[in-house]
């Protein structure tokens, strides 16, 4: 019995060619480097990433495609504050040629903020990396250890003379142990520092794609970027509330200190006022005492004068009484002398 022939529709014409076109995908929240690899392991990992949104840019062959006019929203960190920038320019106009980038335009050392174990379909760990292109502009990207490993392989091919230290893989033990993940995070941070320390490596295309330097991700490019944007806002809000609480406590302590100082000032003013009144009272007392002393002294002088007068009077009376007997004695003596002379 013959099997009936069932025609199978096949794409023809331009649709077939567009179906097989290799589209260059932009680095999204994570797995951007993984998507450029054709290894079976990379395909298996990328297939297990769940329903994470992947964004792409138009390829160079499709020049007639319309440019999306939706605004580009970027998260910016200015010092300790954050802001959102809305730009209506197409992203193609913002892309820069890596060959024309100067050494001074290289970004600062990316900082790994932490890691997260994802359990959508397959369990894996992603690392949250903060990239600062300029002090005013920064963004967050998510990368897996596989992305770091493939970037390291590319850099070995491009720069054979450089050997970048990448934390080794772990085959037999638990890859989700907290201590192990923290040690790996430190190793990946050292790997990123070595990337930025070399001029040629920091400006190569592989590193720029890895860090999304030419096309920074927006907060709504994927679910992970949106969540990272919300987490950034939450962290900023928490930090500002904490600073506000600390400032309020500091203000309360300063108010208390001010009241204590004011009380101390009032006490000192009262003491000064009291001390300023005491000399007047002492002067009054001294004046009265002086008058009394003068009166006493004057009375004492009067008494002394009276005593002296009495003494002088007493001295004068004996002198007068004794003067008469002296005259009498002299008269007697003269008389006696005269009498004796007559007898002779």
Curated annotation (Swiss-Prot):
Topology within the bilayer: Peripheral membrane protein
Composition skew (Polar residues), residue ranges: 14-26, 41-66
Tissue specificity as recorded in UniProt: Detected in placenta, lung, liver,heart and pancreas.
A GO cellular-component term linked to this record: late endosome membrane
PROSITE patterns: PX (PS50195)
Pfam families: PX
PANTHER family assigned: PX SERINE/THREONINE KINASE PXK, SORTING NEXIN-16
Self-association state and partner proteins as the record states: Homooligomer. Interacts with EGFR.
Protein name (Swiss-Prot/TrEMBL): Sorting nexin-16
Originating gene: SNX16
